[in-house]
């Protein structure tokens, strides 16, 4: 559906109006309205600086700041709802300000371009969202930590190649995801430092002839520094790429845990039970309880990956400085932010109240396999048998047990000693699952003391950043 073209601030250069279909095609107001609060804040800082520098009068500056605040109120109450004819959020605000203030409103854009304006708005927006996502990561970590602390001595099979390898403390398994989330939190913190740089005052690309104070607007908006090069200031989208890369890694980590929950909730595993609060039913099979939350997290991950790739492709061939291609940086950014925030919230709820681990089922799984085989080899190696020789011997023992339908614990002491004279009665203690886990007490290992210490460090870290 097309919409009649309205005059734009640049219309006097042209002899005919923009084609109605191109108005729609060109407009970004349908999505960049998400920046309106930041656009208003940035414009208020700009107007204040213009007045302080005597570029406009003090009275004009105060009127503009008040007018922008009125627009903010109108937007929040639904009275101000710009349409596609506004082209973008910046023109929409300027048009409404001019309606309120007349010619005074037209002075707001003095010494400013949409190029430095949109860069400022986007950084203000992303700075807020980064802070929010970092807080969400902390909330998610607290829930995982609570689960881990409850299950320090609960055992779970540890897998490589999705084959049972060695038993683990369930807390150790969850601690791995806590560490992934910590890296995500730190990565966003590093990004925020670079994000906190103001492009405002760079103009279209070359600066301005007016005696502006860029440091002042940066301070008013809470930026720590300004861009040193005006051309770089309006061309740079590094922080958006960095965010999308960091967001992609967050989603990788959430998706891996989601995949495990999906497996654990299956009838074949039954390691967790899903609560009614976080599962759905089937339209045809009444017995089912579907793990929709982790499945959606897993599915939404690809969206964020796609937004990262899309922005990289947009940027790779762009000459400096601004090109209309850069309008394509925002929809993917906004969607990625919303996706990460919703997935973090959903996974936090899932682990807070949406699932319960089944220790008996987990213990039975650990008991009924050969994941203690490495400990038999270690037992012999600790008694002087070369590890590779011990490894090969245990491999033959496992094959024999499989042929006879036995587990290692089912072998008699005589059978053990027939395999190698170094075996003593304490072999049964060495291969008991709790001992297998407890014995791995190397730094960072799954031994209970190591895990207890690791979780204490995590809790200390979280409490320090409440």
Swiss-Prot record:
Q: Which Gene3D superfamilies match?
A: Fumarase/aspartase (C-terminal domain), Fumarase/aspartase (Central domain), Fumarase/aspartase (N-terminal domain)
- Which ranges form a coiled coil? none
Task: Name any Gene Ontology BP term.
Answer: L-arginine biosynthetic process
Q: Does the keyword Lipid biosynthesis apply?
A: no
EC class name = lyase
Q: Output the Gene Ontology cellular-component terms.
A: cytosol
Q: Where in the cell is it found?
A: Cytoplasm
Highest taxon above the source species? Bacteria
Report the principal subcellular site. cytoplasm
The set of disulfide-linked cysteines is none
- CDD domains found in the cross-reference section: Argininosuccinate_lyase
What reaction does this enzyme carry out catalytically?
A: 2-(N(omega)-L-arginino)succinate = fumarate + L-arginine
For this UniProt record, the keywords arranged alphabetically read as follows: Amino-acid biosynthesis, Arginine biosynthesis, Cytoplasm, Lyase
The UniProt entry, under InterPro entries, shows: Arg_succ_lyase_C, Argininosuccinate_lyase, Fumarase/histidase_N, Fumarate_lyase_fam, Fumarate_lyase_N, L-Aspartase-like
Question: Which pathway is this protein assigned to?
Answer: Amino-acid biosynthesis; L-arginine biosynthesis; L-arginine from L-ornithine and carbamoyl phosphate: step 3/3
Tell me which family the UniProt entry assigns to this protein.
Answer: Belongs to the lyase 1 family. Argininosuccinate lyase subfamily.
Entry's PANTHER family? Answer: ARGININOSUCCINATE LYASE
Q: What's the protein name?
A: Argininosuccinate lyase
Q: What is the scientific name of the source organism?
A: Synechococcus sp. (strain ATCC 27144 / PCC 6301 / SAUG 1402/1)
């Amino acid at each position: 559906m097309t919409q009649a073209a309205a005059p734009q601030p640049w219309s006097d250069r042209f002899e005919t109006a923009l084609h109605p279909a191109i108005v729609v095609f060109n407009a970004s107001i349908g999505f960049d309205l998400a920046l309106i609060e930041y656009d208003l804040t940035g414009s208020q800082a700009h107007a204040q600086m213009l007045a302080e520098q005597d570029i406009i009068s003090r009275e004009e500056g105060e009127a503009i700041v008040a007018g922008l605040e009125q627009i903010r109120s109108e937007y929040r109450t639904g009275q101000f709802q710009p349409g596609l004819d506004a082209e973008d959020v910046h023109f929409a605000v300027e048009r409404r300000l001019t309606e309120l203030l007349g010619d005074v409103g037209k002075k707001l854009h003095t010494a400013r371009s949409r190029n430095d304006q949109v860069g400022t708005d986007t950084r203000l927006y992303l700075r807020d969202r980064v802070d929010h996502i970092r807080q969400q990561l902390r909330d998610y970590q607290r829930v995982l930590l609570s689960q881990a602390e409850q299950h320090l001595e609960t055992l779970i099979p540890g897998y490589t190649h999705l084959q049972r390898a060695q038993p683990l403390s369930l807390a150790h398994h969850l601690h791995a995801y806590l560490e992934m989330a910590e890296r995500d939190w730190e990565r966003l913190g590093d990004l925020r430092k670079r994000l906190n740089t103001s492009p405002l005052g760079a103009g279209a690309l070359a600066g301005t002839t007016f005696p502006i104070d860029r440091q002042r607007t940066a301070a008013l908006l809470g930026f720590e520094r300004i861009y040193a090069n005006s051309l770089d200031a309006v061309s740079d989208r590094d922080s958006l790429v960095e965010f999308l890369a960091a967001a992609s890694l967050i989603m990788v980590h959430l998706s891996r845990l989601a995949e495990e929950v999906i497996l654990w909730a299956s009838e074949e595993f039954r390691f967790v039970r899903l609560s009614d609060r976080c599962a759905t039913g089937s339209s045809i099979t009444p017995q089912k309880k579907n793990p929709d939350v982790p499945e959606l997290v897993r599915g939404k991950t690809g969206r964020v990956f796609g937004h990262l790739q899309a922005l990289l492709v947009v940027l790779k061939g762009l000459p400096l400085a601004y090109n209309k291609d850069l309008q394509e940086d925002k929809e993917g950014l906004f969607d990625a932010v919303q996706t990460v925030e919703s997935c973090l919230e959903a996974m936090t709820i899932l682990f807070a109240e949406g699932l319960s681990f089944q220790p008996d089922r987990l213990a039975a799984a650990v008991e009924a396999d050969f994941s203690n085989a490495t400990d038999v080899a270690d037992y012999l190696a600790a008694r002087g048998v070369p590890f590779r020789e011990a490894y090969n011997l245990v491999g033959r023992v496992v094959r024999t047990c499989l042929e006879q339908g036995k587990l290692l614990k089912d072998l008699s002491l005589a059978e053990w000693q027939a395999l190698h004279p170094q075996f003593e009665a304490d072999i049964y203690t060495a291969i008991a699952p709790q001992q297998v886990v407890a014995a791995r007490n190397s730094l960072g290992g799954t031994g209970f003391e190591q895990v207890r210490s690791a979780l204490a460090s995590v809790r200390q870290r979280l409490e320090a950043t409440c």
